[in-house]
């Protein structure tokens, strides 16, 4: 996988996700920079290559439908009626809403490529997907209100599936794997991680910040369990 620019959160995400998945196998990640382009390559034994490639494609697809989609919506939606934190929450919710569908489509567009030049894929192989994002953005009025945000996030939480676990502010999926999707759209945030997970129930251990508690009380009041 390669990307224009210096090593960044996208490179780190793919490297950590794939490397972590195969940490018990002879799989080595190497990051290199050449002419203002950064690449991450994975070396493994031939028998494991199909599995490493599949996981790499999955991670690259997540970068495209998280990092790139968030920036895409951010450019289209100024949302002056919302505070900065409310706007970020709405953008996160919009990214989360079709995450699985977007990811599956993106994986089909990666199929057959020898190298994932991630910015090239975004600009030239995701036209249909980007057109759907433009349509979605057109449904969001410039005067989108905090009340509308509340209703939208409430709807997403009611449609969620599965569980997410919080140990303090660290989020884990049902297999207790750390979740770091929110790091692709800004600073790591437990509330954003909850939204991006698409979970229906939240199980909390340890102590959460007031920000996270307020988020849970507002949007997941009947779906949160403190253990």
What positions do the PLM features span?
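Conserved mixed alpha/beta catalytic, RNA-binding, or beta-rich assembly cores of soluble enzyme
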Residues: 1-188, 192-194
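C-terminal structured domains
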Residues: 174-227
